[in-house]
């Protein structure tokens, strides 16, 4: 019988809330300490925002995988993503990635990834404005319309741009006509856009940044390299499992890693769920444990809760264990990374949402209807605070007793071990909890 040769394993790291959980910090730690050799993005676009503090400086990533700052790491932007090339090149410059020797040999964009065009961003803004009071809270980055083009099969892919620019030109003009029929007041200089895209095509070809990344990923795994899939957004923003319609336009759950990179399901050996020790959300949508009071303001202030992508203040509330357990049910977390625990250092009382009631009835699962979310009542478990700075602590046993009780309750409720505990902003401000 033919035996398949062993290949490098895959770890998928996902947001367990509404994004902004601190995934970038955990990715950076895993690259530095866990010998991760490949980092891949599988879905979303530059609507995501990962902040990494390393090498004495802060990096803000939106579409580029966080592994680009580690010289040993290869980076892939997969077929499931949507790519704004203006933002891609701006992000390289902003983070001074082009100053790193050989950076271009360590990153590839899938030729099957779809392109975000200016027309998509214009449509995104028009669609959101038409909703009036029922706004989704889109970042207006063109993400939704680009995925819509993909599904409608009139989208433009990176391969169209770099392999056949004449064909790309025809498709682009048709796409603009299609949208202008729906939105007659849309104004766009097609010729100017095509000049810009031609420059991008030349640069991508010159640097050899585009390929069939399914093959690349398989070759890397066949050589024994370990892969970390860097999920964007969060489980509760998933197009299927999130708080629909207040969601993103892609699958931000573990299935998105498989379809967004062309990975075999059995290649995934570990799924890490990242959650803050409290909850935050940017923009509109259900948020059962939100604190619209001084406590919420305090969380926002101490946690510096401002969106990396939007610059908007994040709404803040207590950790929602009902949704965290739901995220585990969908993704099958093997480990949890609990971030920003230090933000709770000065709170006398800390709470965790442990049950939902709708019309006084205990719910077995979160509501599927948007209207029901507004009526959900949350039951809480209350904990005593620890009122002790934990920034310098590097082992679980060093943490104050009340802090340990809080963490242990989370893992018992969800049924997943808390392996990493973030106690500060720097890479080193992280506790690895051994079994």
UniProtKB/Swiss-Prot annotation:
MF annotations from Gene Ontology: adenylosuccinate synthase activity; GTP binding; magnesium ion binding
Assigned keywords, A-Z: Cytoplasm, GTP-binding, Ligase, Magnesium, Metal-binding, Nucleotide-binding, Purine biosynthesis
Catalysed reaction equations from the record: IMP + L-aspartate + GTP = N(6)-(1,2-dicarboxyethyl)-AMP + GDP + phosphate + 2 H(+)
Coiled coil: none
Protein name: Adenylosuccinate synthetase
Function: Plays an important role in the de novo pathway and in the salvage pathway of purine nucleotide biosynthesis. Catalyzes the first committed step in the biosynthesis of AMP from IMP.
Reported cofactor(s): Mg(2+)
Native organism: Brugia malayi (Filarial nematode worm)
Binding site for Mg(2+): 20, 49
Transmembrane segments: none
Enzyme type, top EC level: ligase
Residues that bind IMP: 20-23, 47-50, 139, 153, 233, 248, 312
Family affiliation: Belongs to the adenylosuccinate synthetase family.
């Amino acid at each position: 019988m033919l035996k398949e040769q062993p290949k490098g394993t895959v770890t998928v790291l996902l947001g367990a809330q509404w994004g902004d959980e601190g995934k970038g910090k955990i990715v950076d730690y895993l690259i530095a300490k866990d010998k991760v050799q490949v980092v891949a993005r599988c879905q979303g676009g530059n609507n995501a925002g990962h902040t990494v503090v390393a090498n004495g400086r802060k990096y803000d990533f939106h579409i580029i995988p966080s592994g680009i700052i580690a010289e040993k790491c290869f980076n892939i932007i997969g077929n499931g993503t949507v790519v704004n090339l203006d933002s891609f090149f701006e992000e390289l410059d902003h983070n001074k990635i082009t100053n790193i020797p050989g950076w271009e040999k360590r990153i590839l964009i899938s030729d099957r990834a779809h392109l975000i065009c200016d027309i998509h961003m214009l449509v995104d803004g028009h669609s959101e404005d038409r909703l009036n009071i029922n706004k989704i809270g889109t970042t207006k980055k063109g993400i939704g319309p680009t995925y819509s083009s993909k599904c409608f099969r009139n989208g433009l892919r990176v391969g169209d741009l770099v392999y056949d620019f004449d064909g790309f030109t025809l498709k682009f003009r048709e796409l603009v006509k299609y949208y202008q029929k729906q939105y007659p007041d849309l104004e766009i200089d097609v010729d100017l856009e095509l000049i810009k895209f031609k420059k991008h095509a030349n640069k991508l070809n010159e640097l050899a940044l585009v390929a069939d990344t399914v093959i690349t990923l398989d070759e890397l795994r066949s050589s024994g390299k370990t892969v970390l899939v860097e999920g964007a957004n969060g489980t509760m923003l998933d197009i299927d499992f999130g708080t629909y319609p207040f969601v993103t336009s892609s699958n931000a759950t573990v299935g998105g890693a498989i379809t967004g990179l062309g990975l075999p399901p059995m290649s995934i050996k570990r799924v890490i769920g990242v959650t803050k020790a409290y909850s935050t959300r940017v923009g509109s949508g259900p948020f059962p444990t939100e604190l619209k009071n001084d406590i919420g303001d305090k969380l926002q202030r101490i946690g510096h809760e401002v969106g990396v992508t939007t610059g908007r203040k994040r709404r803040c509330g207590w950790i929602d264990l009902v949704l965290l357990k739901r995220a585990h049910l969908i993704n099958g977390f093997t480990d949890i990374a609990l971030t920003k625990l230090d933000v709770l250092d000065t709170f006398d009382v800390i709470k965790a949402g442990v049950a939902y009631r709708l019309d006084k009835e205990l719910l077995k699962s979160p509501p599927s209807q948007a209207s029901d979310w507004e009526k959900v009542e949350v039951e809480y478990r209350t904990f005593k605070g620890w009122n002790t700075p934990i920034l310098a602590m590097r082992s679980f046993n060093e943490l104050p007793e009340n802090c340990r009780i809080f963490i242990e309750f989370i893992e018992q409720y969800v049924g997943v071990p808390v392996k990493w505990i973030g106690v500060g902003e720097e890479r080193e401000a992280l506790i690895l909890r051994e079994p």
